A protein has these predicted regions:
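A broadly conserved sequence feature marking short terminus-proximal activation segments
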Residues: 2-49, 86-147
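Amphipathic alpha-helical interface elements
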Residues: 8, 20-28, 35-39, 77, ...
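Short cysteine clusters
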Residues: 45-48, 70-73, 153-156, 172
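Short acidic, glycine/proline-enriched loop segments that cap or flank alpha-helices
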Residues: 57-61, 83, 293
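Short linker/helix segments within small regulatory modules
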Residues: 57-67, 159-168
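"Short basic amphipathic alpha-helical interaction patches in structured regions
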Residues: 61-62, 84-89, 239
Length: 357
């Protein structure tokens, strides 16, 4: 039993708890929070309540006045506000054990002063109080979700782990646009990989109900969104007057040629020549297919045939999408994202194009 607790002054405390100070207002305690087998411990957003994990060594090296970011929703607050439910329960147990002993000792002191012998005659009351020793139980452990992989922020090098789509480093805040794009493309690949791991019966049922087709369509839709978000972020970061340059152009970054034109007009390289011709052509077909499913349920129309003149589909037919075509589209989109990121990596862009007067 003695190995499960330690004595601190007049109090028995469970392992992992120590009293670090006292004053007129109360007592200050230190309660250890165990890490997992990788040396990571949990943080929980006070706003969205989702969990993430941070390497304990990296965390200890950060300043005490650190403002932590939720990796999912971007809420930022003092790091002490990110205590997890299990960590809070552990701390409350430590405080509760101390409180039980403190109250017991206060009662013992009070009754010892009040205790008097019974009078030899007449009416009277004899008061006695006997306290029982308190032996604290071990603190509850921490058994939170285990990490899948370790990430490291390219900006601050802090190592952390997430359990869902995220947009922020716990220390630096918003992730670079290219990191967000890379993660999004990785998620699309992982989703296709997950489909391939389904049981045969489940796979057949989902395929018959059109679930696979809907996922393939969603993949193309998401790829366009990834490129739009990345291109817009890169463009806005590179040009102080970006808002003026895209004013009145609608969703220009959803369109491949318009995206390329915006960058070339600003003096940057032409995306159409940064990629090989076959990759650019496949991307154009993917973008046209996505547009067709979004606006015409995948049924071929004249607009599609104009964009993809080499298509063997006829007007009125519904296009089909395969897993292989989705994987190729992801690979091509990855190449496009790398090219977009590289556009502004050069020291200085060429002189912007100026229309003839």
């Amino acid at each position: 039993m003695a190995g499960m607790w330690s004595s601190s002054g007049r109090f028995r405390l469970p392992d992992g708890v120590r009293i670090v100070g006292r004053d007129s207002d109360g007592v200050r305690m230190s309660v250890s929070m165990p890490t997992d087998e990788h040396g990571f411990f949990g943080r929980q957003c006070p706003s969205c309540s989702q969990l993430f994990r941070v390497d304990s060594d990296d965390y200890e090296a950060l300043p005490d006045d650190l403002e932590l970011w939720c990796v999912y929703c971007g809420h930022h607050d003092g790091h002490s506000e990110f205590i997890t439910d299990q960590q809070l329960a552990r701390a409350k147990r430590a405080v509760g054990d101390w409180a039980v002993q403190s109250i017991g000792r206060s009662l013992g002191d009070s009754f010892s002063r009040m205790s008097t012998p019974a009078p030899r005659s007449g009416f009277g009351i004899h008061i006695s109080y006997r306290s029982r020793p308190f032996y604290p139980q071990p603190l509850p452990g921490i058994d939170e979700e285990r990490l899948i992989r370790i990430r490291a922020c390219a900006g601050c090098a802090v190592r952390y782990a997430v359990f869902g789509e995220h947009r922020y480093c716990p220390v630096c805040g918003p992730l670079p646009a290219n990191v967000v794009a890379s993660d999004a493309l990785g998620a699309e690949t992982a989703r296709l990989d997950g489909l391939a791991q389904l049981a045969t019966d489940a796979m057949a049922t989902l395929r018959e109900q059109g679930v696979f087709t809907r996922i393939y369509v969603d993949t193309l839709e998401n790829l366009v969104g990834v490129v739009e978000t990345l291109a817009k972020a890169v463009f806005n970061a590179a040009l102080p007057d970006a808002a003026l340059k895209i004013k009145g152009k609608g969703n220009a970054f959803q369109r491949l040629n318009d995206t390329a034109d915006l960058f070339t007009a600003a003096g940057y390289s032409d995306l159409r020549t940064m990629l090989d011709a076959s990759t650019w052509q496949r991307l154009k077909e993917v973008w046209a297919t996505r547009h067709l499913f979004t606006h015409n349920d995948g049924v071929v129309d004249d607009k599609y045939l104009t964009k993809v003149p080499a298509s063997t589909a006829r007007r009125g037919q519904r296009l089909t999408i395969t897993e292989q075509s989705c994987r190729q589209a992801i690979a091509d989109t990855q190449a496009l994202c790398l090219a977009i990121t590289a556009l502004t990596a050069a020291p200085e862009p060429a002189a912007p194009l100026v229309a003839d007067q």
